[in-house]
Amino acid sequence: MLAANDYRGGLGVSLFRRCSIGILLLTCLVTGPAYAELMTLKKRQQLDLSQYSVTNPEASYFDVATRKALLASTDNSLLLQSIDNLSGGMSCRQLLEIPPITNRLRIPGFYPDPQAWRQASQPLFQFEDSVSNLAGAFVATDDDYYAQCLGRFLDQWASQDALVHFHYSPSDRQAWYATESMIFAAAMAYSIVRPELEDQPEQRERIEDWFSRLAYRHAYVPNQTKESCCNNHFYRRALYATMIGVLTEDNELFRYGVGAVYSALNEMTQQGGLPRELARGRRAVHYQNYALMYLVTNMQIISRQGYDIFHLKVDGHTIKDAVDFLLDAIEDASILGENIPREQYHGFLRDNQYSSWMEIYQQHFSDPRIAEFLITQRPIYNRSAGGYVTLFFMDPTVQKYRRPKTEDEEKQQLSVYGKESSPL
């Protein structure tokens, strides 16, 4: 069995060294007015995050007890529908029959062959849905059965060292990418039920040791490419690092997650763009949103440890600048600059899992454009980055009923956002 310390040696410095490779190349790809300089190795190494430490290992990414109490007395039809859907019952015995992934995982790339990618990814999606559904059912019903089942399910995977082995090379990274979301899906779901497993100390120890080994094993992959080391995949790794750091009271992991927020704010353009995401051409807006999905969710975990991270200002920038830039760019792609195509891919706006972060964001800021957009998106579920976010976060007073888009709204969205495109 691999020990967590096997992957700790020089974690921060080694990862930041890889992140520095290719900075000049990327800067050339994304040029134009008001673009920030990408964070250098030296600057990353100089980040002092010693003021950040885990203060409450029992804190999930939302106040579970308070939310369960609210749901128990709500008359909100939208929330009641979600509660009813999750109360149908899941068989723990059937879930425990799902075989843990213990082989050296290998997944084909999405863009070369989407069909092969989807087929190979089904067991991974099944895992993410399983942990998120159990956590959601526990919150919806307050039935300890689901918490205990999630503990047994994760313990089974932990006991067999699942997900530790995966194929990776600089030219074949998909298995590494895929396990990112499996790790944070499991850690976030577990954080919801962890207090219910207090009478299972050995089980908790096995699960948390497994999480720690996965985090260090995964984050310390050698020969990371210039694209993967520091862009949205860095933010995805930061998400599980922060959550597992909390669960295991590991300040090194926790600060790794915090460091991703500092990195994003530091690199932000004057207008609020994330240069590494804007380098994606026709998918620049999509990847700005994609990055925010993990940054905002990560920030929510950090905020639950008592830090006002949503108002953190680095070089004059806050996360609100990135959100405002996204919303502006959706409406008018010309703000992206001369070197980025105005014909932007907007298919993500029709898939509500990509708006999961907005439900969290609205708890900290009340953005009218987001509020209007969410009305036709709810209820929102993201199988890995937050689960049933509408059930967990929505203020019951803002929307009482599910409201699909009208025909006129569909036409208006198409006129503003453009026709949905297939992934390039």
What do the PLM-derived regions correspond to, one by one?
Residues 5-23:
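Bacterial N-terminal signal peptides that target proteins for export
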Residues 22-30:
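Bacterial N-terminal signal peptides
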Residues 36-224, 303, 311-424:
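Extracellular glycan-targeting catalytic surfaces
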Residues 164, 251, 267-271, 309, ...:
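Alpha-solenoid repeat scaffolds
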Residues 269-285, 301-319:
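A beta-strand-loop signature enriched in Asp, Gly, Thr, and Trp
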